[in-house]
Amino acid sequence: MDKKKLVILALALLVILGLAAAQYTPWLYWTLLPKEQADTIIGEASGETALNTIIDINGYNRDRLSEEYAGPFLETQIIIKKLKEYGLAGAEIVSYPGGETWNGIKGELWEITPRRQKLASMRDMVPMLASGSSTSDVTGELAWVGRGTAAEIEAAKVEGKIVVTEGSLGAVHNLACLQKGALGVIGISMSKPYFDPLQMGWAGIGGGRGMRGGPGQPAQAAQPQTPPPAPPKPKFGFQLPVREGDILKQRLMAGEKITVRAQVESKQEKYKMENVVAHIPGTDPNAGEVIFSAHLFEGITKFGANDNTSGSAAILEAARLLNTLIEEGRLPKPKRTIRFLWGPEFSGTSLWVRANKAIMDKTLCNINMDMVGEWLSKNQAFMCLMRTTYGNPHYINDVMENYYRYVGEGNRERIQNRSGFNKVPVRVVAPFGADEPFYYSIETHYGASDHEVFNDWGVQVPGVMMIAWPDRWYHTSGDLPDKSDATQLKRAAAIGAAGAYTVANADDNLAIKIAGETASNGTRRIGQQFVVALETLNGTKAETLADSYKSARTYVEGAVLNEKDTLDSILELATDKAAVGNYILQMKKTIDAVGNANLAALQAHMEATARRLGQKPVVIALTELEKKAAKIFPKQTAKVTAEGYQGYRKYIDGIPAAERAKYPYAAEVSSPTELQLLINGKHSVLDIMKLMDAQSQRKSKVQGILNYLQILKMAGLVEM
């Protein structure tokens, strides 16, 4: 086929794919599971039950009482009690050593003169007392310091006074109290003040916090010297909501002399890391597992109905509904085990994962729920699915997208159906929840929650996150059950349960169905990357045309590599590896064909761009370093996963700094974490660069990647 015909074919294929993505069939709504099974799961899901769990755990901003620290915490008690009530197998509390944490006992702030009135009380609202506040009983004059800059604090002569600020409570405390002699600090919460003037962020103060190296990055080497002095003891901090704080601010700015008395009682409490686990056993213990996760604790003294009591309640409801349907025979027993894990965010989840390496070794994927219960329209939010990165390619992305789409596209009225009785084809609404569309979005990867424990290089269990965003009451006193919605909770529990059950009970036929859907979605994703590539060329200049074209091709080439890796992941579901593998091979050929069509069309666009810029068409040629990189296929060693979550870090940290310095990489590697995950023995170094560049604004360089790989080789983590 000559070049002209290939370009015409490519453009025709792109048009067809574009129409497929844009024109949804208003008469067809499909699920990977048989529709009757999917609808049974949806019907059994109870958003009201999940909402009641949120209210039981976090009905208000409560003060954690001292007796709870002896264990178990109230949250733990409620989850384990319900699991046993629901009949889940293996329901137990698994505790690990914790440490000490601050606990506020009393916090009262009263104006003494010229008026007698209460300004703040921990009894009224727990976040009014800043965490970290020391036991105090002081009387002092108030001093207004504005945003709390060094100049404002200096001008206010704050020694012996209690400062009032609308800046950062912690930063102003450190400067005004610990350095300039102020008695304490009162902060006017500026957390979304124009949306909700009564909410306050969960704020804290302290005498300074130590710094540690990030993942894969060593902390500063210890030097033989006298230990540094202990940080100064913190004083105290109070918070006022904007509505009340503005009154105090205006009085102070008008020159009024105000004296207050602050009474604080606090103590340090020892605590344990409490995790709760349970499972629904599969019929084949060797077939693998699916694991749900949700952090039950957002710190020890901070609470939130949406963040993340809602995620904990939603996976509990997923556990209840699946166990009920399976025990009653309304769903077949799954082939694979479905496991559920609740714990402290990162800190507790990671301890359980490290302690259960045998389970992790056979776990296929993770579904993490974080902030899934909020009323979407009230928050102007979308229910997002955060996919894995290219470093953890997995079909769980497409399985979950299938149910997001089924609920999202089917649960809204379409003009094409206006004359029929079922104007909303797939109505998923809780009896006492919001009757509104399911606003959803399929997103690229985002971390910052417990799925990152599973995605870690030392664990390598691909994890996705379900999360609603934005959240107008995030990390504030306003994160209460009145912002939650039974309909949203029903949808979250049903989608998660359907996704997990699809994987848990997949046979060869369902594996083939998943592969077909993944390939279909993959053509659309490659098409999206093609648009990014076009825009890269559209925005280029004559002097950057060659580099832009190279980058543009990388967007498509990297996407093609990822889609084929994703298809390969499906083979773990198969019993007849040959038959399913052959089907997957055909789907990979489809992906290659789509990729080649895109690249042919991209070349045509490059040539048109070159004419527009008065340049000759670009001819791509590999540099000598790139040719070398194309022949190197790094492979990870057993040490990477031997000790589970973050266990590999000690080998990197153990390389002398002088040796590491010989291989600089920080300026030339967009994400060392992602680079690690892309090492699989099949990707060349050049492939790794393409996979990184295709999903990042910041571009990597071959030499930087080679340098980082050399460090990993010295650590015994990589062979090449």
Segments predicted by a language model, with ranges:
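Metal-dependent peptidase/peptidase-like ectodomains
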Residues: 45, 212-218, 223-228, 237-238, ...
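Charged, amphipathic alpha-helical linkers/stalks
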Residues: 486-567
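Extracellular/luminal Protease-associated
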Residues: 22, 55, 67-72, 77, ...
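Second-shell loop/turn segments in exported
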Residues: 37-44, 59-70, 144, 162-168, ...
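Soluble metallo-hydrolase cores and metallopeptidase-like ectodomains found primarily
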Residues: 124-152, 213-305, 317-320, 324-333, ...
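Noncatalytic luminal/extracellular "stalk/propeptide" segments of secretory-pathway proteins
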Residues: 22-39, 43, 47-48, 52-159
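Short helix-loop-beta-strand segments that form the rim/entrance of peptidase-like active sites
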Residues: 52, 207, 321-351, 359, ...
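Long, charge-rich, low-complexity alpha-helical segments
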Residues: 667-720
